[in-house]
Amino acid sequence: MALSTLEQKLTEMITAPVEALGFELVGIEFIRGRQSTLRIYINSDEGITVDDCADVSHQVSAVLDVEDPISVAYSLEVSSPGLDRPLFTAAHYRQFIGSDVSVVLRIAVQNRRKWQGIIKAVDGEMITVTVDGKDEVFALQNIQKANLVPHF
């Protein structure tokens, strides 16, 4: 998923503090709106608790207060990726080969922006998703949003 310049800057800024607390920074989303939201996804082998999210929120807030990279009012949310985990990097897609994924593209392919299928392969920055038995290849830069699709 292509990150905006702000999201790239924020990722660089908060990766070290998150990792210093013993967590993996899975990714971030900055959602602009009437009430903008900075959403941070963290993970660890032991799982994530509410206290873990609070600790990361406190640490990240301190960094953001000093650096002040966001010019508008926003809410900070810290959470685990969850069952419908967002995918941000080629490594994330590689980790979940064989899993169902929902993809929203920035620029339509075959007149479609929304796709759902099974992650088949990752080759550099190209992601292959099998949709209705046919392989579709998407450039990571063209993926606006992607999430795993949980099955219950």
Swiss-Prot record:
GO terms for cellular component: cytosol. It comes from Sodalis glossinidius (strain morsitans). Required for maturation of 30S ribosomal subunits. It is found in: Cytoplasm. Keywords: Cytoplasm, Ribosome biogenesis. GO terms for biological process: ribosomal small subunit assembly; translation. InterPro entries: Ribosome_maturation_RimP (IPR003728), RimP_C (IPR028998), RimP_C_sf (IPR036847), RimP_N (IPR028989), RimP_N_sf (IPR035956). This is Ribosome maturation factor RimP. It comes from the Bacteria. It holds the Pfam family DUF150_C. SUPFAM superfamilies: YhbC-like, C-terminal domain, YhbC-like, N-terminal domain. Belongs to the RimP family.
